[in-house]
Curated annotation (Swiss-Prot):
Keywords: Plastid. Its main location: plastid. GO terms for cellular component: plastid. This is Uncharacterized 15.0 kDa protein in rpl12-rps7 intergenic region. It is found in: Plastid. It comes from the Eukaryota.
Amino acid sequence: MMNINSSFNNDGTQDPKKDLILSNSNENEYDYIIKLIYENLYNICFSINFVLKKIYLDKFVYKYLPYIEIFLKMNKEKCCCRLKKFFEKDKIKLYKIYHKFKNFLTLNFSNSFTYMIKINIY
């Protein structure tokens, strides 16, 4: 796992001078963003899959359950490769998504999401 320094201060306020910093300087920004998106997609899909087995959710979510299960079974490298191919056509879209949501694309956010779901279930 990579260490991520958030653009938020310890008191929760955002510091515009700070940005996400890679602890692994050998990795280029594009590959890093792809991996970060994958990790968060995985955590969110895992959480959704967990919830679907515990409580009833609407038909819209059930419609996507097979895709979520397929994603969860996919090899990480294969999945990152597919994400790369998808975004290679429009790298600007990838960077727009990343910069718009970068403060939420942390592993802490996904873990908090999973934790909140577990609390609501039990």
